[in-house]
Amino acid sequence: LPGKTYQRLVDNEIEGGLVEDLRCCIVAGSPVIVFRKRRPLERRFLNENVQVLLDEPRNCYTSDEIAVIERFAASIGLDWGGVDVLRDRSSGRIYIVDANKTDMGPPVALKLGAKLRATRRMAQAFAVAFASKKR
């Protein structure tokens, strides 16, 4: 779309020759958890993570960036799902590069304990946001 899209290679390389994608899980339009998905630079475009860390949105984004992610989710009607965010190494800017209406849940490479914590956090946020208050 003219004026709405563009193509750019985001330099999301981090220390150790890895790239890092930030998968932000959205519940009720807000980031709840972040999976830091890391893989070797030469496998940048493959889904072959060598390390996945569970993190909090406030540790990955500024409050202004969280507001941007929330506005993006609202603009596309994303109450529940996941967005992939890349941070450019030289500018520090974030780029939302993908949105999924069915979040994939914890990545395979995440350790079991972190998978369970992530699933509980998402379930709790989902229950608070969407479960009926009536019994």
Language model: regions and residue ranges:
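Hydrophobic residue at the +6 position relative to the catalytic HRD Asp in the kinase catalytic loop
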Residues: V83-V85
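PAS/PAS-like sensory domains
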Residues: K4, L78-G81
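C-terminal active-site "lid" helix and adjoining low-complexity regulatory extension at the edge
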Residues: A74-L78, R87-R135
